[in-house]
Curated annotation (Swiss-Prot):
<dbReference type="Pfam" id="PF00565">
    <property type="entry name" value="SNase"/>
</dbReference>
<feature type="active site">
    <location>
        <position position="166"/>
    </location>
</feature>
<feature type="active site">
    <location>
        <position position="122"/>
    </location>
</feature>
<keyword id="KW-0732">Signal</keyword>
<feature type="binding site">
    <location>
        <position position="120"/>
    </location>
    <ligand>
        <name>Ca(2+)</name>
    </ligand>
</feature>
<dbReference type="GO" id="GO:0003676">
    <property type="term" value="F:nucleic acid binding"/>
</dbReference>
<keyword id="KW-0479">Metal-binding</keyword>
<keyword id="KW-0106">Calcium</keyword>
<keyword id="KW-0865">Zymogen</keyword>
<dbReference type="InterPro" id="IPR016071">
    <property type="entry name" value="Staphylococal_nuclease_OB-fold"/>
</dbReference>
<keyword id="KW-0540">Nuclease</keyword>
<dbReference type="InterPro" id="IPR035437">
    <property type="entry name" value="SNase_OB-fold_sf"/>
</dbReference>
<feature type="signal peptide">
    <location>
        <begin position="1"/>
        <end position="23"/>
    </location>
</feature>
<feature type="propeptide">
    <location>
        <begin position="24"/>
        <end position="60"/>
    </location>
</feature>
<comment type="function">
    <text>Enzyme that catalyzes the hydrolysis of both DNA and RNA at the 5' position of the phosphodiester bond.</text>
</comment>
<keyword id="KW-0964">Secreted</keyword>
<feature type="binding site">
    <location>
        <position position="119"/>
    </location>
    <ligand>
        <name>Ca(2+)</name>
    </ligand>
</feature>
């Protein structure tokens, strides 16, 4: 609509210029010609103001919401947190401690890692003792990391260690995320979700939902949702 009005304004400007030309050529013919000249000049000024306003409006409408009519987008500025990509770093296995804890050699130093966003049944808890499916979860993690030719750790966007000094990370064995594999097999639950350390939360919840549907391991028990 703006484009049509702009075109009409340009046509009006052209007509006004022609009228001014006619008035100038007849200005010597009397008072009527002078009034005609004044009228034509006023029309031209008014038309130029309208055309200028419409042109500005057209330019603004083309860039609404950061997208112009050609389809290209203006760069969007994001915070450092929202654009930060996770990356994997190499490590070597020292030993698997239990289902959700491993000890690795990381950057030349031994470090214990707690798997992010998951919780496996206990095997060494001073009060809970050995919980059902705890040994199975420990054996699963041990097999994955011991058989892997390449171990990698992937920190999330938030804090990297817990109050015990353990690294908080996603652990990969030959490219497969151990955290997700445990959840998919029904040997771990999605737990301890704290932003911004939750980049892979939806992946894990999807795997957990599938494990529940298939009633695998901890989800085969009647009290699976009791917080065990």
């Amino acid at each position: 609509m703006t484009e049509y009005l702009l075109s009409a304004g340009i046509c009006m400007a052209i007509v006004s210029i022609l009228l001014i030309g006619m008035a100038i050529s007849n200005v010597s013919k009397g008072q009527y010609a002078k009034r005609f000249f004044f009228f034509a000049t006023s029309c031209l000024v008014l038309t130029l103001v309208v055309v200028s306003s419409l042109s500005s409006s057209a330019n603004a409408s083309q860039t609404d919401n950061g997208v112009n009519r050609s389809g290209s987008e203006h760069p969007t500025v994001y915070s450092a947190t929202s654009t930060k990509k996770l990356h994997k770093e190499p490590a070597t296995l020292i030993k698997a401690i239990d289902g959700d804890t491993v000890k690795l050699m990381y950057k030349g130093q031994p470090m214990t890692f707690r798997l992010l966003l998951v919780d496996t049944p206990e095997t060494k808890h001073p009060k809970k003792g050995v919980e059902k499916y705890g040994p199975e979860a420990s054996a699963f993690t041990k097999k994955m990391v011991e058989n892997a030719k390449k171990i990698e750790v992937e920190f999330d966007k938030g804090q990297r260690t817990d109050k015990y000094g353990r690294g908080l990370a996603y652990i990969y064995a030959d490219g497969k995320m151990v955290n997700e594999a445990l959840v998919r097999q029904g040997l771990a639950k999605v737990a301890y979700v704290y932003k911004p350390n939750n980049t892979h939360e939806q992946l894990l919840r999807k795997s957990e939902a599938q494990a529940k549907k298939e009633k695998l391991n901890i989800w085969s028990e009647d009290n699976a949702d009791s917080g065990q």
